[in-house]
Amino acid sequence: MFAEIITIGDELLIGQVTDTNSAWMGRELNKVGIEVIRVVSVRDRADEIIEAVDASMKRANIVLVTGGLGPTKDDITKQTLCKYFGTRLIFSEAVFENVKRVLAGKIPMNALNKSQAMVPEDCIVINNRVGSASVSWFEKDGKVLVSMPGVPQEMTTVMSEEVIPRLCAKFRTDAIVHRTFTVQNYPESVLAEKLESWEMALPACLKLAYLPKPGLIRLRLTGRGQNRSEVEACVNTESAKLEAILGEDILDEEDTPIEILIGELLKKKNLTLSTAESCTGGSIAARITSVAGSSEYFKGSIIAYANEVKTELLGVSMETLEKRGAVSEETVIEMVKGAMKALKTDCAVATSGIAGPSGGTEEKPVGTVWIAAAYKSEICTMKQETNRGREMNVERASNNALLLLRKLVK
């Protein structure tokens, strides 16, 4: 069963608002066997909306439209859909009661807010319990178009409570089963070459996707078919073959973020952690503390951006900084030791590098990062040399630091 998503709003196309709705809908629909095959964003222009709707209705069984349902003049989705489906807007007392309930004590009722009770005549109107814009469900030639508000909280509520259950009741869907493996130690092209024979022999019901992240690659194995048990069995069989090929290079089989894996490992071994960060500027600590319960194992971080902080708080010697430089293996070793000593932890990670876009030299170009991980008296280091832009360099260094720590502690 195929679906297309149309998001409406000038704000999406000028980058003022990020479309998070489509990603959420894609995930939730996939869980029930509905595959999103296209996402289209259009301006608040009637002709462009009609063109997009007409094209989607020809290709897909289900068309989901978000946005343009507000009370102001630039919100034209309802009127435009009426034109497309050959119907008109009528006043709904039931919807008006909901509008009054939602706005009560918050916003005074005026003509614009009352206009929210105008709904297409030839459609099923679905109540929106968390907002004033109702949902319109159209059917034509065995296909369905659903128009929903673009406000994420409202859209997710009506999709979860009303739209998805109705779609499942109306359409027969295939079973879709995913298994995602997080793989370390491979560039994408090298991994693809290693898996070529296995991938070529995959059954027709399975599909493999490569999803690179900084320092990691996620392999998503997707099975699709009418019988869930058969699809799951097929996915399990091929997953076992993949595990045999990659062995310990598979970091995780549930697409679990590395910071969660680190937390689970530290709690299991009853260990504490600290970080000493220069070029990563606290991003490692931020990831660790984003996990609920991280206070059980994480003590703190020293952001040693300046050399004087490295010396005064972490005990890095001036001799090391002068002879080897801040971006060096020797410096991160002293930083990681200093973090463990200052914060009294069992483990620590340290980073120092040139994130960019400037600051690089011929000897140490932009993207050069030294990373150290320590577990009690044992220390290991690595040098990161790939330049992918400042943001990506920092993310990659954060990933590599946590991966290095996991390898050391595990």
Curated annotation (Swiss-Prot):
The lineage's top-level taxon is: Bacteria
Q: Name one Pfam family in it.
A: CinA
Q: Where are the transmembrane segments?
A: none
* Residues spanning the signal sequence: none
User: Family per UniProt?
Assistant: Belongs to the CinA family.
Per its UniProt record, what HAMAP family does this chain match? CinA_B
What protein name does the entry list? Answer: CinA-like protein
